[in-house]
């Protein structure tokens, strides 16, 4: 409830109880909702909201042109292909086993029939790869993830962690799906803490082989996509154990990646020593066959070590260009950041679909109304605007932020610039976790905002929520990823004080730290005019101020607590604070990108619509955290009140262009699919679906 | 993110950047999460959280004795019955059609084999009825709802809206499931706004019959439970149309309820004139067969009018003990409040199961740890405590509040006391909406808190969330119900000013209004000692202050806006504010009940544990709304900070008795069922489930 909480109404005008009371009884009359003793019809007249202010006339074409991705052609090709193949569309109800087969067939259809070959783009044109992923994800999210497992995880591990010999041997088979494969990192006992993995790969110099073993049940590889049914290979992450000539006899070289064949190329039988079980029914993504793998002395040739960052020679000597176990492991994991970029990007895609369905239906749906007048659209209720309009604004905000992330990632893949690598790493961790957490909550809000009809499976919220849910966990758990963002900020904070340079995205910290460490300006704290509150400078300053102060304070707290609690204890004592810092930072980055996008929009009316959304995004976030701002007198009480009023007003304004803003996502009916959100005759399409 | 937001850290000690920075780098080293370049092993030592303070020794038996419901015997009988009948247990994966058949068989088994007869308790012993509902709901939520449709909705409408002739004719058949039935109120176009229903029941004096008609597609009865497959009858809500002798020819007497046979008693064929379609696959509750009904001149005898509140004589004359259409409709709907009480109560049951699974697993699961020390339980992370401990405290809070609601409801059913009717009506609307919204969000938090293993269907969060989701919507949409609570408060506010009496639950408004309308006390606003913050008087005062102020202010705002916008417009302009008021009020009622429950607990150690939870509930809510309190200087900046610190500390304290608090719910493993939450050998039970 806190998000709707009126944090400030107490400063609202004082009441004259008696007069009010009389009127109140009459007011409450208009409300005659379900299952309640219902008073008589109201007598009071009303003016409906939508008549309240002049509506902005948005050039929809210009807006969608501005929003449109570069790779719309391949996306449309994908939509057309699946549209032409009803046999490849996922029905509303399907068993797990059938769903898995269908999903595999969808992938085969995409690659072998539609001729879309995602693998080549994984390395060479990531923007295109992500566009493909977004499109197939909206066909069925399971397909998006299945494709990601095959090309980005299994394929990606081979080309990014292996060397030329691996590429030569596996590229074509992975590309054309002859070599289906898995990415086997997680174990039953270790997910987030990958350094704790226990599977071993022991070098046997006699036979020139590695022996893969699962030392105990906790080390069973778990959740491995493609393992339960379709995979022929797995990239297995295991501790490399080398024989030594000292008393210990062996040496643990840390976690490395190995290609392990798990099923016979011809018979598809599980290979000897490999035990595969099915992880079973999941909350969602049941088109993906996640399995659990146990290895009993499975032998693989030495060549199957993915040896880009570390190699073992014929005689068992270890070589690497990188000095330490941790550097090597870091480099290994660093190559996999693309998965996270993809999830952030795909999550915005889900948010777009969900917001579109909820908003289109809320425009159509009417319920209650002023006495003796037609019922009103539920989107005219202030509460419905509160549920959906900041969400619509946020969708735009995240759109621009993730497009930027994808660009940066592509650039990084080309230049391998070190600064950029660090930047993309933290940005992808932050955006992935922030956006997926938001979308997960938004999906529930959308379902609820559509009432009973939102609960029909055909209207999509259920499967979208169930499929998307795990975006918060895989490719790095959100709570863990945010800590990486916080750690990165602290590192840069330190650099700043040592006079180092700060990278592009974060540079505001450098510029602003000094300003923000001083007390808030008591004069501007009182400015409450709309022009001021809608000034990007005020908004950005407020976000940056908050981040800078959070950073400075947590640094001090960490320092204090580490004296008594040690590093681990101090970090834990400040953990909520650190997570807040990370989120605050990400919100700041998102706002900066949104402001830039508004500025660069060439069409004036489109720009005006974006500006409304951007202001709503900014002020809604400030209002949500008004306690922080009030507590240090960054805003005075009346300014807080003005921010709240303006937020409600902007929600109402955005409602007036909601249709245009949603249309600009250019999601055709065959992508949104929910009958209640069809662009024409929604009700009759809905009744048809159930058989009338 | 707002809930974790550090609203106050800026007042934390100022930093010495340089020293801090050096330490920070070391601190950040301990963090080596998945898929990221991971730094070297940390060197700093740590003290784990759980060693920080002395643990309270809770007498678990005393605590569970205090928590235990009166009707544990019948609940155990139900559990035992289903335990002994594996054929009646719902498998993880099941098709919609099979699920519906199974669900019907579960109900038949319960009634005819286990001999549990819920129908007699609907009217005579509601507490027992709700206990049965809770127990069957934890077997399968679909069964709980299916049972509710049969006995509380269909059966309840017959006995509560009908008269002796209906009871005599239908009681036994409903009781023994020969007369399966539906409650057909909602239409495609009208859910919350039931006064807008369009189905008609026209009296035909020639044949002494009513003719039921669906005038247009928007009037198709929709979402009707039991209609798609099993129902033989439906209580249909339709506008009663009577012939008149004036020029209009007919008169619309408003919505009434009629018993309409929809399927043949022998052949089970749909009867002539009735068209039934299947609403299809839903987000959850797929064991319930919701259908859509269209009527084409379906004739029923005059006796089928449920005539308790209004009757039609042989010659078409209308009689009623109640004066107006609205009074009659109100009385009709008022009889159905039990469904809402049941949902609030059942929702707490779901929350208990979900919190139990998440907390038991969080105690077991270990991930990361201080350097060279064993990994720690994830419940030792401050962030995990933040996710789950206020939730555990809230579960206790809602437990006591809904137990109270059920008691009041039973009393009301016995006494029919008018004051109590009004009280129960508002309280059930408020608690139903507040608790179900909370539980819906909590289920997502629990899934996420359990990481990947929380996503295995077998661990329950998916089905619990999907099934529970609609609790927010049916039996009255939450956003609509909260408005009823607000309207009720405004009504009482008015009564107060007219010198009327306030009923029990709300009486604090009477007592406190005068105090709270004055300015906050600048002295107590600065008190920040733990004793003060944990004093129930401070906590209740803070909650009541907020509610009183919100009420007073919204009354004034409504008065102001109604001048220009009319009643409907003014209400809408203040809608967010009104919803906040309603929530604030409900939170206050919940806190008062919790404080009372702590006070009355006979065992000192159990009492101490409850006190921890109660303080956490109270302070967490105050902190969530700290902006409001700060803005009117109800709390000074340092007090705000103290509240935040104490909240984190209490989360940690509650964590230390989390096992005991969860155990006291007395949910046996065969009820929680999630392998990851088994009370012993959870991991090995989990591996067994997937086939190892
Ligand atoms: C559908 C699905 C598909 C998957 N596919 C693959 C795959 O193909 N290959 C593969 O290798 N893996 C795969 N995974 C595994 C996935 O990567 C892991 O689930 C993920 O890394 C999280 O690890 P975990 O589940 O062990 O959670 P844990 O690490 O056990 O986390 C559990 C909880 O503890 C909290 N927590 C943990 N550490 C900390 C900390 N330091 N501070 C605060 N809180 C903490 C987390 O926030 C989380 O809420 C898949 C998982 C699923 C569910
Ligand atoms: C699984 C299931 C089982 C059901 N079983 C039955 C049954 O057996 N019998 C039966 O008769 N019905 C049944 N229903 C219908 C149920 O009672 C309705 O769905 C419910 O009353 C809500 O109505 P609605 O769906 O039309 O939502 P709407 O009233 O259309 O509401 C849609 C949205 O608009 C918002 N809204 C509406 N009015 C206002 C307002 N005044 N102010 C602010 N916001 C507003 C709501 O908050 C909601 O978010 C069932 C529904 C489902 C999904």
Curated annotation (Swiss-Prot), chains A, B:
Localization per Swiss-Prot or TrEMBL: Peroxisome
Protein name: Acyl-coenzyme A oxidase 2, peroxisomal
Residues at which FAD binds: 186, 192, 225, 365, 384, 452, 473, 477
Catalysed reaction equations from the record: a 2,3-saturated acyl-CoA + O2 = a (2E)-enoyl-CoA + H2O2
Annotated signal sequence range: none
Originating organism: Arabidopsis thaliana (Mouse-ear cress)
Subunit structure: Homodimer.
Enzyme class: oxidoreductase
